[in-house]
Amino acid sequence: MIEQRPVSNLIGHLILILGIIIVAFPIYYTFVASSMTSTQIIRPPISLLPGDHLVENYREAIFGGVERVVGVSLERLLWNSFVVAMAIAVGKIIISFMSAFAIVFFRFPMRMFFFWMIFITLMLPVEVRILPTYKVIVDLGMIDTYAGLTLPLMASATATFLFRQFFLTIPGELVEAARIDNAGPFRFMRDILLPLSKTNIAALFVILFIYGWTQYLWPLLVTNDAKMNTIIIGLRRMVDWADASTPWNYVMVTAILAIIPLILVVVLMQRWFVKGLVETEK
């Protein structure tokens, strides 16, 4: 039994509070800046209390302000990011789940060779893969399409490895029982593996959704049409619009609105996310 010491508890809580402040302060600072005019933002020091233009800034940014700056509405930027993040998260989970299922539960020649070929891709930096991938997308005519934005990012060696490690912990008795019941591979996957994997899938979904939402380099390469930009690319274009007249109030509003979906995903799936991480490490 671990002895509870008041001093240790106090130090632990102080460290946690400090960590929360370090993480939360930039978000709060951005929110405060989103309630001020662009002139107030570029004249430090900025007040730590919200300004008088909160509603006005958000209303103007949503109803045409951002579109005047980058040529595409804020709603379209958010929608593009949502489509990309959902497609990448769901696509990675489906492909990785099926790949791990085949590697663990099917016996075919060179299956471990194929697994290690998938795993070795983790050692390749993005810069090595991005140019040949871009060439393929150009040749297939997928520039400025959702397919071009998402398909190259759907394969995931990490998710395949995690699913494989989890499937290896499935008792052999379950597999034998499924065979005795005359259950085929897909029925076994649907009725046994999917229910057992739901917490792992939830944890991976949160991680992969954030990964897809925050993509910058790939969308920057494969989108020329402003209407296909994601919210991250939109932010970059707003900052680069004109150094002397950058609408920093719109930039801060857009940054806050870009964070909200990620916070909602984490909060709504927090219980499943934590449970999935704990069960994965067992």
UniProtKB/Swiss-Prot annotation:
Which residues are listed as membrane-spanning?
14-34, 86-106, 112-132, 146-168, 201-221, 248-268
The record's GO CC annotations read: plasma membrane
Question: What is the membrane topology noted in the UniProt record heading this document?
Answer: Multi-pass membrane protein
Q: Which residue range or ranges hold the ABC transmembrane type-1 domain?
A: 78-269
Q: Where in the cell is it found?
A: Cell inner membrane
Has keyword Repeat?
no
One GO BP on record is: transmembrane transport
Identify the main location.
membrane
Source superkingdom: Bacteria
Sorted UniProt keywords: Cell inner membrane, Cell membrane, Membrane, Transmembrane, Transmembrane helix, Transport
What family does the database annotate?
Belongs to the binding-protein-dependent transport system permease family.
The record's note on quaternary structure and interaction partners says:
The complex is composed of two ATP-binding proteins (UgpC), two transmembrane proteins (UgpA and UgpE) and a solute-binding protein (UgpB).
Q: What does this protein do?
A: Part of the ABC transporter complex UgpBAEC involved in sn-glycerol-3-phosphate (G3P) import. Probably responsible for the translocation of the substrate across the membrane.
The protein's name: sn-glycerol-3-phosphate transport system permease protein UgpE
| Species name | Brucella abortus (strain 2308)
Q: What is the lineage of its organism?
A: Bacteria, Pseudomonadati, Pseudomonadota, Alphaproteobacteria, Hyphomicrobiales
